[in-house]
């Protein structure tokens, strides 16, 4: 009889909390968006499934060895942990707060102690540690994106680099917005958290995940979900802003035919770009370095096997682990916070400002330029490649059925990828000197 009672007590459903129920529903919504609505399915599907796995009661798939120790809360073991973090209380919540403020070296020591006491990390926690904790997955994905990117439109019309840079204005205004919410006492955001949220405005998922893992890992789940959800909604978010900021006549502007870019230019550009940016801003070197390496494999034409692997098999494999790793952060105690609502609101504001900034910059450039730029391509400065460029082309065709803007829009679109990586480097450098 006792064994039957123990069996029932060991059932996950006997331990499920309201927070876990809510997060399971959120995860199911993400799966529905990925499968039924085709919203960024390559990321939202593994993220949603990872969220399901993370919230299964008593499974502990997303828990580290230390999390498991605190969950079972044996008094003698809690005493050891409390001494290490100088906590006079054996209350688990108090100890968790002390651990959160402990230096990384102490946190690592506590993980080792938990492992020595016989606790093991769950599979999703291991995925997270390697894929995101060490920054491996976002960087490999950036390499794959580089292998898929053609710098030709940007090199053929270099001034579109300004449009990509202007679209990053949404990042920095959103940082100020997050700090403003903190100053007003509405939602608490630290400077590193504000910077991690702001990068959502770059519409670049890997960059957002990379920066969040460095500056605000506790917000990574919400930031990743917001970034990829809004990237999927680009065709809905951008058109109203583009139409509101342009006239019918401006949308009909036809741009001059792009020149042919030589193979030599395409080979030299990623090397020069990396050297110029990395020597001035070393913190941008990891992201930009992998991006330029991937692009050099494509442009050189001598490593087709590597190029093919980077932009297909490798990026697909890493995307699976990245999505599951992000899902590991969709646990109730981390996701169901007032900050999550603030992140979702600030994220869409960042997208809107980035879109508007690119369009406005194009209009400003037209005031001083002989060869006019169609302002619609300015919205492609956000680095949702190639979705933002397709939206620019679609709105242009609505105004003039013979006005094809896709290749012109790819210039600022690629520039946006470069600019978001540079913006992330600036954030890392600036904040590392502040804290």
Swiss-Prot record:
Reaction(s) the record says it catalyses: oxaloacetate + 2 Na(+)(in) + H(+) = pyruvate + 2 Na(+)(out) + CO2
Q: Where in the cell is it found?
A: Cell membrane
Which Pfam families does the record associate with it?
A: OAD_beta
* Cofactors (names): Na(+)
Enzyme class comes to: translocase
GO molecular function of the protein, one example? decarboxylation-driven active transmembrane transporter activity
Query: Which keywords has UniProt assigned to this entry?
Result: Cell membrane, Ion transport, Membrane, Sodium, Sodium transport, Translocase, Transmembrane, Transmembrane helix, Transport
Where does the source fall among the domains of life? Bacteria
For this record, an example GO cellular component is: plasma membrane
Membrane topology summary: Multi-pass membrane protein
Q: Does the entry feature the keyword Repressor, yes or no?
A: no
Q: Does the keyword Hydrolase apply?
A: no
Q: Membrane-spanning residues where?
A: 13-35, 42-64, 123-145, 165-187, 215-237, 267-289, 309-328, 340-362, 404-426
InterPro entries, A to Z: OadB_MmdB
Q: Which residues form the signal peptide?
A: none
Could you say which EC number(s) this protein's record lists? 7.2.4.2
> What does the record list as GO biological process?
sodium ion transport
Quaternary assembly: Heterotrimer of an alpha, a beta and a gamma subunit.
The record, for PANTHER family, names: OXALOACETATE DECARBOXYLASE BETA CHAIN 2
Family membership:
Belongs to the GcdB/MmdB/OadB family.
Query: What does this protein do, in the record's words?
Result: Catalyzes the decarboxylation of oxaloacetate coupled to Na(+) translocation.
This protein is called Oxaloacetate decarboxylase beta chain
What species does this protein belong to? Haemophilus ducreyi (strain 35000HP / ATCC 700724)
* Gene that encodes it: oadB
